[in-house]
């Protein structure tokens, strides 16, 4: 199976998001990379499901709470930008203050 660098990146983010979900289920607080991966995966999958950019920008900020992350993680992440494939093409989705 030959994957492009972009496909490899998407696969890595997806795998990291799976790990993050399992940790949340066990009650483990997420670190910086896990939080980024979980929110990014939510956006990519939402785009594939046909949700709009505006919808994902709003919903992306509701994926995680401060209580689900290690101390200081919410302050470290100001914005998350994800290039996602929508039914009408690839678009950049920006989520401001994603962990509230």
Swiss-Prot record:
Query: Annotated pathway, please?
Result: Nitrogen metabolism; urea degradation; CO(2) and NH(3) from urea (urease route): step 1/1
Q: Name one GO cellular component term.
A: cytoplasm
Q: Where in the cell is it found?
A: Cytoplasm
Catalysed reactions, as listed in the record: urea + 2 H2O + H(+) = hydrogencarbonate + 2 NH4(+)
Protein's GO biological process: urea catabolic process
Name the enzyme group at the top EC level.
Answer: hydrolase
Name the UniProt key words of this record, in alphabetical order: Cytoplasm, Hydrolase
Q: HAMAP family from the entry?
A: Urease_gamma (MF_00739)
Query: What protein family does this chain belong to?
Result: Belongs to the urease gamma subunit family.
> What is this protein's name?
Urease subunit gamma
């Amino acid at each position: 199976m030959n994957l492009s660098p972009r496909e490899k990146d998407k696969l890595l983010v997806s795998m990291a998001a799976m790990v993050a979900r399992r940790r949340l289920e066990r009650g483990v607080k997420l670190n910086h990379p896990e939080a980024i991966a979980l929110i990014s995966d939510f956006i990519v999958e939402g785009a594939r499901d046909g949700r709009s950019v505006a919808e994902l920008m709003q919903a992306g900020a509701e994926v995680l709470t401060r209580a689900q992350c290690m101390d200081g993680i919410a302050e470290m992440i100001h914005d998350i930008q994800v290039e996602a494939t929508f039914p009408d093409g690839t678009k950049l989705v920006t989520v401001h203050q994603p962990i509230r």
